[in-house]
Regions:
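Intrinsically disordered, tyrosine-centered linear signaling motifs in cytosolic regions
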Residues: 64-65, 208
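PLP-dependent class I/II
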Residues: 2-4, 9-14, 19, 23-34, ...
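Conserved N-terminal alpha-helix of the aminotransferase class I/II PLP-enzyme fold
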Residues: 65-100
Length: 389
């Protein structure tokens, strides 16, 4: 009897992949579920971005394989993005690598730096893909705690007490998902010092810095960060392009070359039209477009999400940023999944239970802001009917 590889038994199907099947079944039964669970922007990219894609797609010479390193136009635009938003200088030819989405980049970075058995630090709570990929690759996972009473920042005193002799990578994610916590400049400085002291590569995942955030930051702003850090960024959230699969990593020339060596043996560059349109998106993202799409629209939706949290008697930090709202459930609920299942089946609204992000999320729920205002208002009214009766 044919059996799958051992690594398949080490992981589970992604929570949202499983849960969306259930939601689809409920919708097929006429339940009309409103999903406030996934962070997939529902707004379109700019018109200029779409026009550029169509223009290139109509060019009969634009449909061949593209270089894995990415076309110069895209890498130059990505370097310009870092200069504009973070005032960080990057060499577009050697310090930027385009990705076909951040998920594949997590795989490529881990392959480039870790042998089986090497140790990796992963935040709890944190993005589940960090854990899944390291399970697939056979690294040793060590979780470090993020806690609300510490502003969801790393506890460096606790980290220093660990045996770090076999740690190769440390994953961080600021602005944080799922908590919305924002790294202070001091946090980034401590991370760089920690990496230098222990010969660890810190990988900061930074796709949310432009969402509901008036002061975008990058770990690359810290002197010396480029020598010991890698940063992910993405157009999925900031430019409303999740399905386009356009992301990037920035670091020093050597680290980028190692990652490119892995990546070049796995895939090619994405369609030329996507690369040129992504470059156009970064170039035409005016302050007005950014403020309307990444601040004002999400601010209205955030107000509605806060009302939902209040109906559920959940506590939340009003200073969190990003496209989610993270809230702590009250003690009257024994289990967060019982609560989200009640909301799903009685209010017909799909919210995310925090336990999927780690044990430190088991008393929390997450509301996505990626739904039209009208849908969010309907979701609020449905939840009121169930929980205020």
């Amino acid at each position: 009897m044919i059996q799958p590889a051992n690594r398949v038994t080490e992981i589970q199907e992604y929570y949202f992949s499983r849960k969306l099947k259930e939601v689809a079944k409920l919708n097929a039964e006429g339940k009309d579920i409103i999903s406030l669970a996934i962070g997939s922007p529902d707004m379109p990219p700019s018109k200029q971005t779409i026009d550029k894609l169509c223009e290139v797609a109509n060019n009969p010479n634009a449909h061949g394989y593209q270089p894995t390193v990415g076309i110069p136009e895209l890498r130059k635009a990505m370097a310009g993005f870092y200069k504009r938003w973070y005032d960080v200088e990057l060499d577009w030819a050697t310090e930027i690598q385009p990705l076909i989405g951040s998920k594949e980049g997590i795989l490529h970075v881990t392959l480039a730096f870790c042998n089986p058995g090497d140790e990796v630090l992963i935040p709890n709570p944190g993005y589940p893909t960090y854990t899944a990929i390291n399970k697939i690759l056979g690294t040793k996972i060590t979780y470090y705690d993020l806690r609300e009473d510490n502003g969801w920042q790393p506890d460096f005193d606790a980290l220093e007490k660990m045996d770090l002799s076999h740690v190769k990578l440390m994953w961080t994610n600021y602005p944080n998902m799922p908590t919305g916590g924002v790294a202070k400049r001091e946090t980034y400085e401590k991370l760089v010092a920690f990496a230098q002291k222990h010969n660890i590569v810190v990988v900061n995942d930074n796709p949310y810095s432009l969402i509901l955030n008036e002061h975008p930051m990058s770990i690359m702003q810290v002197p010396g960060a480029k020598d010991c850090c890698i940063e992910f960024n993405s157009l999925s959230k900031s430019h409303n392009m999740p399905g386009w699969r356009v992301a990037m990593i920035s670091s020093n020339k050597t680290f980028i070359s190692w990652i490119l060596k892995v990546k070049s043996n796995i895939d090619n560059g994405s369609f030329r039209g996507i690369q040129l349109a992504a470059a156009e998106a970064m170039l035409n993202n005016t302050d007005e477009w950014h403020r309307e799409n990444n601040i004002q629209n999400y601010r209205r939706r955030r107000d509605i999400a806060e009302e939902i949290m209040k109906v559920l008697d959940c506590q939340f930090d009003p200073n969190q940023v990003g496209m989610f709202l993270w809230g702590k459930i009250p003690e009257k609920y024994a289990d967060v999944e019982d609560l989200t299942e009640k909301i799903l089946h009685e209010a017909r609204v799909f919210l995310t239970p925090g336990f999927i992000f780690g044990t430190n999320g088991k008393r929390y729920i997450r509301i996505s802001l990626c739904a039209k205002d009208e849908k969010m208002k309907v979701a609020l009214e449905r939840i009121k009917k169930v929980f205020e009766r």
